[in-house]
């Protein structure tokens, strides 16, 4: 059994000052009132043009972000590499909905791939479909509603952006993981990712979908996706996570009067997560996975499953704290 309790290994890339800083930051964030008010105060201060950006950048931003640009991230990437920790560049911009913003996100993702192609310490790229396509448009596609002529053109432009990213990832042979999002746009995202897999995963898994296993239907979807890949002759890549939108999903389901897509309890999420790991290992010659989990039991279970199979087909999380 692998031990995850050695904090000297887990935090070897951190200085004592950084650890103390992180400790007090998380302590403050552990207070719901302070967390809630902190965000509002910070937003107000920014709107009033008060000198708060430096404080944010040296506290919360520094803890969770590598930098504001690829160049700014470079130093941190090199530092982490000294401790055998690899990096994934994620251009995280949400709430933007103009064509200009979508094109900017596409260009940043393409630039990340260009940078990764020259840097072996960046094994993956990642993006969210809502970073390059309008949420409401995806929702309409998700439920099979007819698009207007203008909407169809808009959707075609979004598909062009996605294809451009996936094509470059394929040319560089750098896997790209496409994030999962809310259930009411996920079918649309799944359809797009499946098309990209059929096009670019003919030799190996380059395009990865993301499965949120806190949804009760994702294990079945995983098996259906694998069946399609075998039938159509391509590999599938899956990043397995538990999920990030539980409160939002339950609230919408209750408000709109439909059964929640969320599992009945955490135990069910854990069960399906581990069953997905099991299924991937049983079908390792056609499936590549990234186990995106901070759950120690699931990590130990995957290590146990890996013993009789080839390690080269499995991608474990690179975060040493997992």
List PLM regions with ranges.
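Positively charged, amphipathic and often flexible ligand-engagement surfaces
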Residues: 1-314, 320
């Amino acid at each position: 059994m692998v031990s995850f309790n050695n904090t000297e290994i887990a935090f070897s890339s951190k200085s004592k000052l950084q650890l103390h800083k992180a400790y007090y930051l998380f302590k403050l964030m552990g207070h719901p009132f302070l967390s809630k008010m902190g965000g509002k105060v910070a937003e107000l201060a920014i709107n009033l043009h008060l000198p708060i950006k430096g404080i944010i950048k040296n506290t919360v931003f520094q803890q969770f972000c590598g930098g504001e640009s690829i160049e700014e991230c470079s130093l941190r990437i090199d530092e982490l590499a000294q401790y055998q920790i690899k990096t994934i560049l994620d251009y995280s911009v949400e709430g933007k909905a103009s064509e200009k913003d979508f094109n900017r996100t596409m260009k940043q993702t393409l630039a990340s791939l260009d940078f990764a192609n020259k840097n072996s310490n960046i094994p993956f790229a990642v993006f969210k479909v809502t970073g390059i396509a309008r949420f409401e448009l995806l929702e309409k596609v998700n439920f099979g509603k007819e698009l207007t002529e203008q909407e169809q053109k808009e959707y075609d432009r979004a598909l062009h952006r996605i294809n451009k990213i996936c094509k470059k990832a394929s040319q560089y042979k750098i896997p790209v993981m496409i994030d999962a999002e809310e259930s009411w746009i996920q079918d649309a995202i799944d359809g797009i990712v499946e098309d990209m897999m059929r096009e670019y995963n003919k030799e190996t898994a380059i395009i990865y979908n993301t499965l949120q296993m806190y949804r009760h239907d994702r294990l079945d979807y995983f098996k259906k996706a694998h069946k399609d890949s075998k039938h159509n002759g391509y590999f599938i890549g899956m990043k397995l996570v538990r999920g990030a939108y539980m409160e939002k999903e339950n609230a919408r389901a209750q408000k709109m009067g439909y059964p929640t897509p969320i599992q009945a309890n955490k135990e069910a999420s854990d069960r399906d997560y581990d069953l997905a790991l099991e299924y991937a290992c049983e079908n390792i010659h056609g499936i590549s996975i990234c186990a995106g989990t901070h759950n120690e039991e699931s990590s130990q279970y995957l290590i146990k499953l890996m013993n009789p199979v080839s390690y080269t087909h499995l991608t474990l999380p690179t975060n040493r704290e997992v």
